[in-house]
Amino acid sequence: MSLSLDGVDLVHADGQRALADIRLRLAAGERVALIGPSGAGKTSLLRVLASQWRPSAGRVELLGEEPWALSAAARQRLRARIGLVHQAPPLPPRQRVVSAVLAGRLGQWPLWKSLASLVYPLDRAGAHDALQRLDLGDKLFQRCDQLSGGQLQRVGIARVLYQRAELILADEPVSAMDPVLAGHTLALLNREAAARGSTLLASLHAVDLALQHFPRVIGLRAGRIAFDLPAGEVDRAALDALYANEQLQAERASPASEPAVVHIPRC
């Protein structure tokens, strides 16, 4: 079992409940999409799974470990086995792309190697290989602030590939890309995860991409799991219920003279 959540709740300091009674299991090597309306709790769930946020209640097990039962040092070692792809990668603007990719293994290297790599990239070939898979091999020595949003997202994915993470958590990893590039990137991420035996959980607003690229789809609504189904069994009724509020808003915005057309939001 790659990850397991039993009865997980998350309540923020202001009293807002982000997650409620989450029960979820992913086997090693599974590839799963997480969908739902804005504010459903997708990012909160990924942060709990990355052991960045401690749940208010319930049990979390990641890669055979209970993160909040570990010492701080052991928990940091566990995090080094987990790759988190951010919607907006937190990369220093003046940092070179090569350094951004190599940072994926800072938690796995001894301190001297991590410090040395910040001054002089020690594995340029490895970084280039990861970038080349995402058609960014020519950006190796560019500064991060010279890249587009979609390019920065692909750098974030290259970083996780270089990290060789056992568990990949991707939070809206292709939101800044056009549909063709987004599909190409998700296909590559799935192939890489399958080839390495890594578990992949990706949150997506683009429902069509989730259904096309992932064998299993989880719908999250108001902090709760609304459905957990094989992609082929996710029907219109399930999606209508998942996005009910957004559909109602779309209907109200439609002119009275035109029939209301409900579109499942893409991003």
From Swiss-Prot:
Name of the protein this chain belongs to: Phosphonates import ATP-binding protein PhnC 2
Binding site for ATP: G36, P37, S38, G39, A40, G41, K42, T43
Gene Ontology molecular function: ABC-type phosphonate transporter activity; ATP binding; ATP hydrolysis activity
Enzyme Commission no: 7.3.2.2
Taxonomic source organism: Pseudomonas aeruginosa (strain UCBPP-PA14)
Family to which this protein belongs: Belongs to the ABC transporter superfamily. Phosphonates importer (TC 3.A.1.9.1) family.
Chief location: membrane
Translocase among keywords: yes
Keywords: ATP-binding, Cell inner membrane, Cell membrane, Membrane, Nucleotide-binding, Phosphonate transport, Translocase, Transport
Subunit and partners: The complex is composed of two ATP-binding proteins (PhnC), two transmembrane proteins (PhnE) and a solute-binding protein (PhnD).
PROSITE patterns per UniProt: ABC_TRANSPORTER_1, ABC_TRANSPORTER_2, PHNC
